[in-house]
Amino acid sequence: MHTPVSIYLKVRDMYPQSALMESSDYHAGENSLSFIALCPLASIGVNGGIVTANYPDNSRTEEPLTKTFNVEKAMNRFINQFQVTGDNKNVCGLYGYSTFNAVKYFEHIPVKESHDEQNDAPDLLYILYKYVIVFNHFKNELTLVEMLSEGEESGLPELEAAIENRNYASYNFSVTGPVTSPITDEEHKANVRKGIAHCMRGDVFQIVLSRRFIQPYAGDDFKVYRALRSINPSPYLFYFDFGGYRIFGSSPETHCKIENGRAYIDPIAGTTRRTGDTVKDRELTEALLADPKENAEHVMLVDLARNDLSRNCHDVRVVFYKEPQYYSHVIHLVSRVSGMLNEGADKIKTFIDTFPAGTLSGAPKVRAMQLISEIEPHNRGAYGGCIGFIGLNGELNQAITIRTFVSRNNELWFQAGGGIVARSQDEYELQEVNNKLGALKKAIDLAVKLKN
């Protein structure tokens, strides 16, 4: 039986710089699709204020961003150069990410520069792939989609042979040192207290402060992804290989989804640990739902999502509110906000106007991001940005980049944070970060034990 993971293991060495996106719900009629994208045809990236576009004819353009040539225009111009006809054209689009750092192209936000000379990863990168393997788990169907120029010979026979191949390389994973963090527990608690002080002064109502961890390793980081997806199945499971670095994770949160003329944001605000004991978890859920601090934070972020969508939408409504959702190590409170796109509204602009998520920045959003840049000791990179798909028709589905690893130079970087309000307590906020990182740390431990 073919699964997304089993096929990915077979094709990844033959088709480097590939992407795997899985659904964790194989039995639902909706959201039961998984994808493997192979063989980059074209790409658009932004780094250092320069837009770089690569095309199927091997041509390349570089152009600086200006007041009149912004990311929205660059993305739309790139997308509009590709016209796709035929079946399954809805899966032909751009797969990639926007880092939290990309906000500097959308708002006047200072972002700490990276001092890592080896870190040449773009702030924003989306790729158009030649092949997309589509799994419909509900119908138990597998479809191979190929993008061909007129007169071009198909490469599907080679792909089909790779899928049926039973002899493929496998690799081990091991850790080569302890997990470290650029800041200590006490330093993170001091940062939390700074956030509380800004809330008390009225600079912000809420601010999300995070902390990074680093795990040195050797071997195959795909083992960590496999462990994570088994420990912590989430609505968004993904493994992107960009050559010199990988981004992979199991995100529970939709940043922005646009389909059939409606835009959706699913804010998560309110988190408690999960014990695995049904009775105890029910008690923890009831306490979370009744907690004044968590309720105030949730209301604030639902309102922020409504405001973000209202910039380009009408009929903005709350679809469901404070729904408890259960994951391996935590319980979250989740709402869904949706709006109908205004006539003539640009879908890319609608996406950009929601970025970054309020649940990863704070409220008011711009001031919160300015303070984050002052308080956190490093730029966030991928953490708190988004990752996913942008269709050539502008429809999109982007997850928030949380519960995520960035793998580079034999190091795994992972990060978590919490929403700080005036009544927050530093020790509780430290524990919330540890709760959120529980699944990631457990995945590393399990990956070491996984045999080929």
Enumerate the language-model features and the residues they cover:
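Extended alpha-helical targeting/anchoring segments
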Residues: 1-452
